[in-house]
Amino acid sequence: SEYNPTYSSTYNRVIERGNVICGTNDEFPGFSQEIWNNEDGDRWEGFDVDICRAVAAAMFGDADAIEFTIVNGKTRFEFLIDGTIDVLSATTTFTFTRNVAKKLEFMPTTYYDGQGFIVRKTLGVSSAKQMQGARICFSSTGTGAKNIADYMELHGINYIPVAVKPTEKTKNVYKRGDCDMYGTDRSGLASNRLSFDDPDRHMILPEIISKEPLGPVVKYGDQKWSDVVRWT
């Protein structure tokens, strides 16, 4: 029989509006960043951005039938659930809790990552295991806090946690010198390092302390819309 899913509020809203609203990070080179050039003016570029453009192309045959809304660790799920955005493409980790408790539907993983650490080379360390007593900063809303706690406990390392609220960028707290080491997905560390004024003075340590399957997210229960995003 013909496939005919139930009414999808997001799908119908997108059709009526004529474009897709994508929630993504800002200042994340390689994944999502607004760049100005003489030919196009301001234009969003990056891996997560291209995923959203592909969804727009699947819906309308036009990859530019898209709007981008900047989200942070706190607003990304709120905006998705309340309909401010249609799809979230912002280096978001697929977890059991987010899937079940927050009523979110994760699409196929588009990037397999793992959490790591970045430090200033002046510290003279080559491993996270040498960071006894260090101040370690991480986003208060991500998976980082538990990953770091588990890793440090496993290796008997005492540290000072510095949880950064979503209203402030963790990389800026690190750049200010308010922590000795910064922990997040290694793709994020590499991207953030490139944005520093002095990238050569910072190094990503070799440890990978978690597995982070990243991918786009839609609201749970919107079957027709989730099919569009999943099969794009």
Language model regions located:
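Extended ligand-binding regions for polar small-molecule ligands
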Residues: 1-5, 11, 49-53, 57-58, ...
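Extracytoplasmic small-molecule ligand-binding "clamshell" domains
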Residues: 3-90
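Short helix-initiation/N-cap motifs at beta->coil->alpha
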Residues: 7-8, 65-78, 123, 160-176
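Sec-exported extracytoplasmic/periplasmic mature domains
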Residues: 15-16, 56-64, 81-85, 122, ...
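Bilobed "Venus flytrap"/periplasmic-binding protein-like clamshell domains
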Residues: 21-30, 41-59, 93-95, 112-169
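Short, solvent-exposed loop/turn and secondary-structure capping segments
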Residues: 33-35, 147-151, 194, 229
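Acidic, polar ligand-binding/catalytic clefts
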Residues: 53, 57, 61-130, 186-210
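Extracellular/periplasmic bilobed ligand-binding domains
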Residues: 165-196, 200, 216
